[in-house]
Amino acid sequence: MSIPLPVQVDMVLEDLTEELCGLKEGTVFLQIEDGVVKTYGVRHRLENRVEPGAERDSQVVAVRPRQVELLREMATDVVKRRTQWTTGMMSYRFVMRKGSIQVSVDYKEQK
C-alpha cells in the first residue's frame, strides 16, 4: 500500500526541519511523480541564514520549530485539497515577518 501524498509531504517537511530552522526566507520544493515525492529540498540565499545567537542581538527573526509545524500544516492542507493532482512540481515560498511565517504555494501539474 502506498503512503498518501499529504503524509509524504508532512514527512518531507519533518525531514527538512533542521535545515529550515534559522532561515529568514526560502522555498521548499517537491517533485512529485504518480503521487510519490521523488525529490525535494530547500532553496535559499546564504545571507538568509541566521547564525545561532544572532536573533538575541538584533531584530532578526528566523524560522523556529513552531513555524515549521505551521508550514507542515499548511502544506499538507494544500495537498489534501488537490485530490486529483498526482504529477508535477510543488513549491512553498516562506518568509518570516514580525515573528510569524508567511507562506505562498505554487504548483505546476504535468500531464
Model-derived features with residue positions:
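Binding-site signature for planar aromatic cofactors or substrates
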Residues: V7-V9, E18-C21, E25, P52-A62, ...
